[in-house]
């Protein structure tokens, strides 16, 4: 598979397809920040969203026009129609054979209907309602502080750009949340100084 063959759906396209599925999900990554901004601030090569691991079969059924491939350490494996991703799989890409392109990147999370769990440190748990917001058009997205925490681990130029654009608009609460968790997980991160000055 060509990992660069992306023609990603927009969050609006995804939301329309999932509108009748009563299970928690939310857009993450760069698109989550743009949903928070209320406008697209940069190009996006993919569309990432999270679902609870146990709910993946329902999402797969709803997005039945796609073929799904597990992704681990840069390797892609076709996920047979009725198989579940292994416990060591946290990412599944959806491929549109008609368009010959990837459409979505599905992140499998460990949370419950009520709780959000940070996958890189499962001791970080919050009520899901506190971590997920809705765009003006009703699309669920991960709140900006948590999105930026994910981006802090291996900060690429686009992640730095996302942070720079987000910083002036972060609420005091989001700034403090991000500072607290950066100090815990990435205590030398340069964003801490930006957030506290």
Language-model segments: which ranges?
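Compositionally biased terminal segments of proteins
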Residues: 1-197
């Amino acid at each position: 598979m060509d990992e660069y063959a992306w023609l990603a759906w927009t969050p609006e396209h995804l939301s329309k397809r999932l509108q009748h599925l009563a299970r928690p999900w939310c857009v993450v990554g760069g698109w989550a920040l743009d949903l928070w901004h209320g406008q697209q601030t940069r190009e996006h090569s993919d569309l990432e969203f999270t679902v609870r691991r146990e709910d993946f079969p329902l999402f797969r059924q709803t997005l039945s026009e796609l073929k799904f491939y597990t992704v681990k350490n840069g390797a892609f494996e076709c996920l047979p129609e009725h198989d579940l991703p292994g416990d060591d799989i946290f990412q599944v890409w959806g491929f549109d054979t008609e368009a010959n392109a990837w459409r979505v990147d599905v992140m499998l999370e460990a949370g419950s209907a009520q709780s959000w769990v940070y996958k890189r440190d499962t001791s970080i748990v919050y009520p899901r309602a506190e971590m997920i917001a809705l765009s003006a058009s009703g699309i669920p997205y991960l709140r900006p502080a948590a999105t930026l925490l994910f981006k802090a681990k291996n900060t690429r130029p686009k992640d730095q750009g996302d942070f720079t654009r987000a910083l002036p608009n972060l609420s005091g609460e989001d700034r403090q949340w991000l500072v607290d968790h950066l100090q815990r997980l990435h205590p030398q991160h340069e964003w801490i100084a930006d957030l506290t000055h």
